[in-house]
Amino acid sequence: MSIPADIASLISDKYKSAFDNGNLKFIQTETTKTKDPKTSMPYLISHMPSLIEKPERGQTPEGEDPLGKPEEELTVIPEFGGADNKAYKLLLNKFPVIPEHTLLVTNEYQHQTDALTPTDLLTAYKLLCALDNEESDKRHMVFYNSGPASGSSLDHKHLQILQMPEKFVTFQDRLCNGKEHFLPTFNTEPLQDAKVSFAHFVLPMPESEETVDEDLLAMCYISILQRALTFFQDWLNENPELKKSYNLMLTKEWICVVPRSKAFSDEMKIGFNSTGYCGMILTKNDEVFSKITEKPELINDILLECGFPNTSGQKPNEYNY
């Protein structure tokens, strides 16, 4: 697993060059930190009109694979990771939600509905370890939007990596604070915050990076993914069109899976991917930005509309695990 020691500066230099040359678009007009008065869930709401230009799912011409095309101006590392050290490439996101937003892309075409492999997970975790910097308070998150209702816009398998906003504490951080790493059993469920509306499954990660390997990551991922996928069995009668979709988020501190029922809220004309389910809300529309900054409790309702009801306190057999 050879991730260059200077990976942070490689990303930074490539981003500066791509930004200066107009190869990517980043325009953020306003950011507001707020909190839901009922659930205490913290939100960082960013208004980003530049995202209007980002293609949505279904807008890419059939048969086209934008992530398969070589784009030297966006490529940080063309080949690394995996058994042959050629399994992945690291690209800059053409439509970054924060500066230096990157994509971990499989060099061989795989589908975004495919499960993550142990190698995918370990490569992502190693990137987190290389990029996080306690001295400068830099912390990163990897996320994977899988399935048509997850907020993913491209079919070529890719994970995304972004730096967490400074001093932003997610509800997953609070949930795992002071908790030791564990794997769920029939008697011990993954963590859920009973106050938030939507189903989510969270496990604390081990404190020591050295104890984290492919097996541990795969066991964490599979155990919470299985619980998320039970919702699709339970709800198929009610909604036969439902396609398996979920968001996965991984930091050095925790791993989280959120099952998804819809990519967009009909109620509010806003879409979410993984970032929304840890409180980072992106808006393209002025009216939506005004509404949710004035009444942040609306976000809890629309996150539920696009997810499934919270099962906190229920045993697996109570939701057909």
From Swiss-Prot:
Substrate binds at residues 54, 93-94, 145, 151-154, 160, 273-275, 280, 284. Belongs to the ATP adenylyltransferase family. Ap4A phosphorylase catalyzes the phosphorolytic degradation of bis(5'-adenosyl) tetraphosphate (Ap4A) into ADP and ATP. Can also use other Np4N' nucleotides (where N and N' stand for A,C,G or U) as substrates with equal efficiency. Cannot catalyze the reverse reaction. Additionally, this enzyme can also catalyze the phosphorolytic degradation of adenosine 5'-phosphosulfate (AMPS) into ADP and sulfate, the reversible exchange reaction between inorganic phosphate and the beta-phosphate of a nucleoside diphosphate (NDP), and the synthesis of Ap4A from AMPS plus ATP. This is Protein APA1. The N-terminus is blocked. Its cofactor is a divalent metal cation. GO terms for cellular component: cytoplasm; nucleus. Present with 19600 molecules/cell in log phase SD medium. Optimum pH is 7.5. It catalyses: ADP + ATP + H(+) = P(1),P(4)-bis(5'-adenosyl) tetraphosphate + phosphate; sulfate + ADP + H(+) = adenosine 5'-phosphosulfate + phosphate. It comes from Saccharomyces cerevisiae (strain ATCC 204508 / S288c) (Baker's yeast). Disruption phenotype: Inactivation of both APA1 and APA2 promotes a great increase in the cellular concentration of bis(5'-nuceleosidyl) tetraphosphate nucleotides. Residues 50-70 are annotated as: Disordered. One of its GO terms (biological process) is nucleoside catabolic process. The keyword ATP-binding applies. One of its GO terms (molecular function) is ATP binding. It is found in: Cytoplasm; Nucleus. Pfam families: Ap4A_phos_N, ATP_transf. The record marks 160 as: Transition state stabilizer. Its EC number is 2.7.7.53, 2.7.7.5.
